[in-house]
Amino acid sequence: MPSGRRHYRLTLSDAVHAHEEQIRLFGGRSGILSVDSVLSAIGRPYSGYHLRIHSKGSALLESVIGNHGFVDGNKRTAVVLLFLLYERSGFELVGLGEEDFDLALEEFVVGIAAGQMSRPEIEDWLRPRSVRMA
């Protein structure tokens, strides 16, 4: 867990490992289409603009999904990286009320990939589901 207010900084190794694990578990073609696209996507949350965890998460999801840095599995990789960012920063994502969180998350990510959600809308979805770990 980070000290103070700093959030975990994702690495290229984190991204490659997450991608390879998702391909191994669920299938698809392994490989990186563009290292620069992956580095750009995982670096975007750390620009000075994204200070809160849900803001970092929204930038990460939008970039990993939109940049298509991997041959296959970009949405799955983005979700794994989001959970890694949250966990290592001392946060977790939780469902709201009676929400089926897995289904809500799937619909959310598919909506991002389809271009149906802006970055502020992504942030608005994450904000109430972002909880600091005890």
Which positions does each model-derived feature cover?
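FIC/Doc superfamily catalytic core
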Residues: 1-134
